[in-house]
Amino acid sequence: DTTRQFQWDKIKERLALLENIQLQPSTWAILQNYKNRNGEAPLVRSFKRNAYGRVADTLGIERYQSVPLYLLTDTLVPERYGQDGELTRFIEDGEKFIKAEPMFTGDEWMIPKKYVKVIGDTIVFNKAVFVDRHNQNIASLERSGKGQWVVRSMNPSTTGRHLPPYAQETPLGMFVLQEKKVKMVFLKDGSKETGGYAPYASRFTDGAYIHGVPVNAPRKTQIEYSPSLGTTPRSHMCVRNATSHAKFIYDWAPVNGTIIFVLE
């Protein structure tokens, strides 16, 4: 299947979801555990090892960099993992846990406080980026009025590929833009040696960034385009773009105020 298209039907569905969840006043939060910075999540009740030799829940969400989700009736052993960066509705505060509803995972869960970053009840999500793993493209849209969204960009991209042990797919989900770097320096596989950098990097989950064409050391100057964009998955997990488009996203999309949808 070499025909590439933008899946506007799926994009419309997700925009409707994004509008509908904002109709009622909510306190929004982000699940966070980048590089296990908030502590390795406890083992879920039933787990498996994936192709990378890492523990994952029964739905395939890895333990590494993820957040433990507990049933409302049992805060001893987590049931599932929630993804770093997932948009979450904060429902109720507690002593060690909060009750919250991760938007992509669904349902209400008890989540240890240290994994939840509350971003408040005044935030409005008027900007959304859609990454399509199947068609290898990216689109950005901005809300111009009730039920109205304008397309700001449509571009070819490449997403992460399944290639153990280092490269893996860009995860599906509904994420909040978490941080931005003008240069995201990367290491050579399996080493501590610098491999180069990716320009205009915007991180949304785990180590996955939307970024420009990677520049391999010793080269320092930026590269605008790669003929592989829009073809097949080829990155470690990141979403590779033409560098000028990565800069557009970097300049246009606010941290904690932009939603990134990864769809199939």
Give a label for each model feature.
Residues 81-84, 171-172, 255-256:
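Short, flexible surface segments
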Residues 72-82, 150:
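SH3/SH3-like (including bacterial SH3b) beta-barrel domains
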Residues 40-65, 223-229:
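Short beta-strand/loop turn elements enriched in aromatics
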Residues 112-221:
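Gly/Pro-biased beta-strand-loop elements
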Residues 62-74, 237-243:
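Short, structured beta-strand/loop micro-motifs enriched in basic residues and often containing a Trp
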Residues 1-27, 184-264:
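Exported/periplasmic cell-wall-interacting domains
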Residues 1-37, 78-117:
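SH3/SH3-like beta-barrel superfamily modules
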